[in-house]
Amino acid sequence: MEECLLHGRLHATIYEVDHLHAEGGRSGFLGSILANVEETIGVGKGETQLYATIDLEKARVGRTRKITKEPKNPKWFESFHIYCGHMAKHVIFTVKDANPIGATLIGRGYIPVEDILHGEEVDRWVDILDNEKNPIAGGSKIHVKLQYFGVEKDKNWNRGIKSAKFPGVPYTFFSQRRGCKVSLYQDAHIPGNFVPKIPLAGGKNYEPHRCWEDIFDAITNAKHLIYITGWSVYTEISLVRDSRRPKQGGDVTVGELLKKKASEGVKVILLVWDDRTSVDLLKKDGLMATHDEETENFFRGTDVNCILCPRNPDDGGSIVQNLQISTMFTHHQKIVVVDSEMPSGGSRSRRIVSFVGGLDLCDGRYDTPFHSLFRTLDTAHHDDFHQPNFTGAAITKGGPREPWHDIHCRLEGPIAWDVLYNFEQRWSRQGGKDILVKMRELGDIIIPPSPVLFSEDHDVWNVQLFRSIDGGAAAGFPDSPEAAAEAGLVSGKDNIIDRSIQDAYIHAIRRAKDFIYIENQYFLGSSFAWSADGIKPEEINALHLIPKELSLKIVSKIKAGEKFKVYVVVPMWPEGIPESGSVQAILDWQKRTMEMMYKDVIKALRENGLEGEDPRDYLTFFCLGNREVKKDGEYEPSEKPEPDTDYIRAQEARRFMIYVHTKMMIVDDEYIIIGSANINQRSMDGARDSEIAMGGYQPYHLSTRQPARGQIHGFRMSLWYEHLGMLDETFLDPSSQECIQKVNRVADKYWDLYSSESLEHDLPGHLLRYPIGIASEGNITELPGCEFFPDTKARILGVKSDYMPPILTT
């Protein structure tokens, strides 16, 4: 039997196993020893802990809770809603007995994919087989039910958002909210001379917003509460730095501002990730420097409540899993929640306003769309010099600093309360003291969740909140799998997981009609479909579907003869010393991900008579960089970098990457996702890094009969103006061949200028071709002359790590 593609949704129920004999599990001498050891060292239960999993070949897609004290007839009665995009011969149900370290295999049941391919419901008792495919002792069977729904049966497949009645992403913890308002931010600040003229519907022009100024105003004007979560919060930075836009009190640091607000009686609470090991393996590569202990010390003994919050595991994992979670994973949500004046003013009532996205309130984040390397070193960046990619980099040795490109948003209306509730859930689980503002007691001042714009207002938004988080980090999750499923949560091996960010991405990609534009700090995943080139793909476990969904979407459009384009912007390399083991390992995973996608695209082009077409006309990858000529009056450092280092080479060549830290996807100019979640397994898993994101659209600006021309379109055009240094008519339709070829041509030219021996003028734009080649079969190769990133000895295609576990770098 050949493998078949399962692309759609799988509804599965695992009921029970009948008359199980525990020979495969804990019986006999070994079982009694293990039980005694567990009781002696205080782990485990000294009894069977049976659970079942669902796999599509070697990709784990579902797992039940553990059942104790039922060694012969475990009953789970758990249902699963599974997004799939896998090649498989069988759906495999595995029964295991959990141990403190690892698990004992009982056996596996197999249902051929061809039995479910046409959508029939299959409800059967399946033989449980051992590794040799023989029935296990006693002839046990597992009772399961399966039904598959292919994407073509999805009423939203390829249809975009058809109307304002679109209900949002199904099976999620938070429902979609209407009557909201969203402000979109590119970078921490927009100076007054960044003014692209971008026409929108209704005769308006796009107007950019200023993120850190708005956050400064929101904190300054709060009267009752200021709640902040971050991967890092650094007390010594200032939010307002534009000398042409001074603000009263704007010269204060974040730390002093928060202390001042707390002393005025505002409840100021910070949940900052407690970098426990400060993950030594990564830290030596320059990947982590969060100031967590400095921040805690700064607020000690003040009115500000600052809690360092470790990424604690839920209770369901093995000892090894729990150790992995607490030492390897992070709290990555970046939110600010405040009470605010009413939009109309003149009222004593207050409302909730929230900020969500990729920007932490810490050093190295303040930047503008100009992303200067050298010219702000005596002004905005003199006291905020960030360059973790070179050993020993310092303002005294000069630039290039690492420019920072990021995306954030402000949420108003009912959606802002969902962000508040997320904070309350997290504080209740990990904050300790009961100090949250009691909203009921402020009921006469803070209005309950209500629309901030009327449904007739053409600027109105519908917005939904998504997360990656589990019961170890958020209180209030239901205990039973049935209640969890009803709340849009996934039950794992005794932990409850919110994985809705991944679901939101999958849903949006499947809906897409014309094009997708992604900016993300990482791009790796769907490892179940990687080539087994020096690895065992089943051991990588970067199983999230996003890269595979993108390539399957392109393939489906090629088959249908319809135009569809995907643009992806990533950093040149993940932040850190580029030659280091961790950075090189991540680049290797990224290469394997791109390769998997290009192989899909090239195969589809061949099968549809389009052999010889450039796959970059369908799927194209970019990075950002800058290069500046020296100007009179520039900051002169007092020292020099060490000779023959990346640092001195970059300084002399006057170039460096612009770090892409964004986590954003735009679909058809009508739908946008912005958050803290990267396109990697850490962010998309739900039980690894904690994340938050919004997905939203403007009901009056959909891509139905004509192209969408609302805020999302304006935002994309403004980003492209930032990256390409120009506006062009072809950019209005990213789905066209003319557009993708023009963008590729410009990015190729900019890469040639960036990587050339010398440059007589500033780089005219920042968008660079990602420096890889694509062979005829889709294999990723070196671009001629581009084995290493400029000024480094770091391989562009990365190197597989022999010592770093994939769970750390995926």
Swiss-Prot record:
Gene3D superfamilies: C2 domain, Endonuclease Chain A. It is a peripheral membrane protein. The active site is at H332, K334, D339, H661, K663, D668. Its EC number is 3.1.4.4. One of its GO terms (molecular function) is phospholipase D activity. Residues 1-126 form the C2 domain. Its cofactor is Ca(2+). One of its GO terms (biological process) is abscisic acid-activated signaling pathway. SUPFAM superfamilies: C2 domain (Calcium/lipid-binding domain, CaLB) (SSF49562), Phospholipase D/nuclease (SSF56024). It catalyses: a 1,2-diacyl-sn-glycero-3-phosphocholine + H2O = a 1,2-diacyl-sn-glycero-3-phosphate + choline + H(+). Ca(2+) binds at D187, H371, H405, E722. Induction: Activated by abscisic acid (ABA), ethylene, heavy metal, cold, salt and osmotic stresses. The keyword Zinc does not apply. Highly expressed in roots, stems and flowers, moderately in leaves, seedlings and siliques. Not detected in dry seeds. Ca(2+) requirement for activity depends on pH. Active either under acidic conditions with micromolar levels of calcium (PIP2-dependent) or at neutral pH with millimolar levels of calcium (PIP2-independent). Keywords: Abscisic acid signaling pathway, Calcium, Cytoplasm, Cytoplasmic vesicle, Ethylene signaling pathway, Hydrolase, Lipid degradation, Lipid metabolism, Membrane, Metal-binding, Repeat, Vacuole. Belongs to the phospholipase D family. C2-PLD subfamily. Hydrolyzes glycerol-phospholipids at the terminal phosphodiesteric bond to generate phosphatidic acids (PA). Plays an important role in various cellular processes, including phytohormone action and response to stress, characterized by acidification of the cell. C2 domain is a calcium-binding fold, and the binding promotes the protein association with membranes. A lower affinity toward calcium can be anticipated for PLD alpha due to the absence of two potential calcium ligands. This is Phospholipase D alpha 2. It comes from Arabidopsis thaliana. The lineage of its organism: Eukaryota, Viridiplantae, Streptophyta, Embryophyta, Tracheophyta.
